[in-house]
From Swiss-Prot:
The modification Phosphothreonine is found at T296, T340, T360. It comes from Homo sapiens. This is BAR/IMD domain-containing adapter protein 2. The gene is BAIAP2. Residues 348-367, 447-457 have a biased composition (Polar residues). Residues 320-334 have a biased composition (Low complexity). The lineage of its organism: Eukaryota, Metazoa, Chordata, Craniata, Vertebrata. The IMD domain forms a coiled coil. The isolated domain can induce actin bundling and filopodia formation. In the absence of G-proteins intramolecular interaction between the IMD and the SH3 domain gives rise to an auto-inhibited state of the protein. Interaction of the IMD with RAC1 or CDC42 leads to activation. The SH3 domain interacts with ATN1, ADGRB1, WASF1, WASF2, SHANK1, DIAPH1 and ENAH.
Amino acid sequence: MSLSRSEEMHRLTENVYKTIMEQFNPSLRNFIAMGKNYEKALAGVTYAAKGYFDALVKMGELASESQGSKELGDVLFQMAEVHRQIQNQLEEMLKSFHNELLTQLEQKVELDSRYLSAALKKYQTEQRSKGDALDKCQAELKKLRKKSQGSKNPQKYSDKELQYIDAISNKQGELENYVSDGYKTALTEERRRFCFLVEKQCAVAKNSAAYHSKGKELLAQKLPLWQQACADPSKIPERAVQLMQQVASNGATLPSALSASKSNLVISDPIPGAKPLPVPPELAPFVGRMSAQESTPIMNGVTGPDGEDYSPWADRKAAQPKSLSPPQSQSKLSDSYSNTLPVRKSVTPKNSYATTENKTLPRSSSMAAGLERNGRMRVKAIFSHAAGDNSTLLSFKEGDLITLLVPEARDGWHYGESEKTKMRGWFPFSYTRVLDSDGSDRLHMSLQQGKSSSTGNLLDKDDLAIPPPDYGAASRAFPAQTASGFKQRPYSVAVPAFSQGLDDYGARSMSRNPFAHVQLKPTVTNDRCDLSAQGPEGREHGDGSARTLAGR
């Protein structure tokens, strides 16, 4: 190898070291920085995925508590579990990406900068030393030849000249070998770094392949079953069909008081002696469809093509899933319609009116007062009513107008449609007043005199004037109510305050108003308006007049 070839290789060796230090290492640092950003983004994806599948699990819990969608809840649980396993595999890939690639590359690049600087310096020093030794031998040989040319005896320097030539040849060989080895070492160092990067990237790719393979295996195994589970939305589970058939064969039951599960999705106990109510006119055209179709959603006891009006996704809060109704005849449909009534509590003995906070007073089965046979009667809410979690009840505010949809109240409950919210359901009839044909409201009264209204309506007589609360102690025991100021909350629902006054009256208050025979005369004094403006005598006189009237 000529000297010029050795110098060329020396320059190539230096360029390899400089390329590693000035280009490879900075690029590797940038690669590590981008890898950290990628890791951070994937960590954010895993965090979001955990929240996503936690929400999916909750949806599965809701579905599993439904009689009609229990198997879909199991499917949602399986989906969440499968994706949890896939997510665990992704986390393993992230750990490998961080530990086997980013961390080790970051450590290598910091150590490598110092190592390469030292290696290049060592190579340059050794190469310079060998080059200087060669140059020195060549200079000595040149001097020796000049001296032999001027000497009278040239043979005297021939042996020494041969020694210098051999030394120069050895020095030059050593230099060339060192430069060649240095170039090889530089290329090896460069290749070692790229191989390390590829090796670590292969480890990450291996984990990535395991992640995708695991996901493909799990999804390919479960996906057909999941698709089969949701292929027919109208298909009712066999257990729900059997339950509906059992309900239809055992008589009327009420889907009220749904409290057996978190979402209250159970069918309530049957009402003792409940009788089916007539089917509302708007249900008549759809009775045939109930028999023809496999299943039809029932909401608030109403079914038909206007089901969108009662969709829980349309204009109210989402209701819990309900099981669908099996095919029924017209009589069974009427039974199921009447069974949307709220569950009636057990009735106390007739000779006892004592109640507690968790009991309701017996509800009557009186007719709706003033209900027209040829038209729809309207009532006005005088109290607010909240349905709560029971989808069969109707919520309304004080002053709302309600159109009655059935001709007869059932145990103090009536079925109607709110003109404000367009929702339908059962509501306590004593919370409302019947509107006359001219739009004015009046208190409703029983059309069947042999039956009693709910205890909150015992005073609802148009020809009865109730004295103010201060007309004697006997009248204070019974709540004062008038036709124009009926603001006392009716007692068709559990209100324990009324039970204290009922013990004083016994069974006779059950059939008639105990104050119906009292005829009051108007007082001649007006001292109740402002007692503070009168003297002690005036107040005493006023109190005496009140006592006189009360005594009568």
